[in-house]
Amino acid sequence: CDLIAGGKDGLENDEKGIIDECIRHIYDDYFANPIPENMPILEDLYNALLKHRNKKAERIANSLVLYVHGSQNYFNHRTNVDSQNRIMCFDIRDLGNQLKELGMLIVQDAVWNRVSQNRERKIATRYYCDEFHLLLKEKQTAVYSVEIWKRFRKWGGIPTGLTQNVGDFLKSEEIEGILGNSD
């Protein structure tokens, strides 16, 4: 939500608290009966924020309208990714510029979840990221990339970044953290 609703300064702590409360509420049905049809979508958060009856909650809900009912509603659906497959491929090429950063963060989060699950089962996870320099262009995805790159190896992950644009890759402020944690 910070990326969508936070603006240039991000969300305030009380706004994060409102979102946290709403998210806990919308997951009640899913936790009671964890089937795919009960998995909340972005519209459920939007509706919970409107029910909250608070000016800040209403402001956050208003910032979600484009992503819930508007032209950017790509993520207002249940996933079609089978997370049980041995091999998963995410393609965010067709996302517009406005959603690309969000898409990259969602993919990175899904990969991290897989690494975490596989660690418990003592299985190595190979992660190949093509056009890796694109993750390093945006501050939020660059910082997250360094964070997961450092943690991957401890958790049985084998990250591999691929790029044809080495110049952009090396220009990133975050590159030292990645190269320092690479073989």
Where are these regions (language model features)?
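A short helix-turn-beta junction within AAA+ P-loop NTPase domains corresponding to the substrate/partner-engaging
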Residues: 174-183
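Conserved H-loop
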Residues: 166-170, 178
